[in-house]
Regions:
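Acidic (Asp/Glu-rich) sequence patches and key acidic residues
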Residues: 1-109, 113-118, 128-129
Length: 129
């Protein structure tokens, strides 16, 4: 089995080296955070509904992009739906870099509420692992 190397283009705010955003403290990953935020029953709990859980996650205006490597993860808080990944040996066509103003507003509101500073911008990064 080989090593995967991916290029990632995403619109968001880089968290910086050795930085996991404060709102992520106590959670295993961003999906775990979203599941807690949703208030829906979690996997294994009575009433858990995967379809509702997935719908909540996909409708949330923010996503987290991990880059660098699995051994040394770095994060970008991103506007959901802006991430494009090109794996080694493949090219992806970028047809538009426009980001919907409503999505940007919802993203900025989330960042303000969670103490994430900076302005979103297009970031090109890589993932090795």
């Amino acid at each position: 089995m080989g090593t995967s190397t991916d290029a990632i283009l995403v619109y968001g705010i880089e968290c910086g080296e050795d930085c996991v955003p404060e709102f992520m403290e106590g959670f295993d990953d961003f999906d775990d955070y979203l599941d807690d935020l949703s208030g829906l029953p979690k996997w294994g709990e009575a009433g858990h509904d995967f379809v509702k859980q997935k719908a909540f996650r996909e409708s949330f205006p923010v996503s987290m992009t991990m880059h660098c490597s699995y051994e040394y993860p770095m994060y970008i808080v991103a506007v959901r739906g802006t991430e494009t990944i090109a794996s080694r040996g493949y090219a992806n066509e970028i047809t538009s870099i426009a980001v919907d103003e409503e999505k940007i507003s919802a993203f900025k509101e989330f960042c303000e509420k969670n103490g994430i500073e900076g302005q979103p911008k297009w970031l090109l990064c890589s993932m090795w692992g």
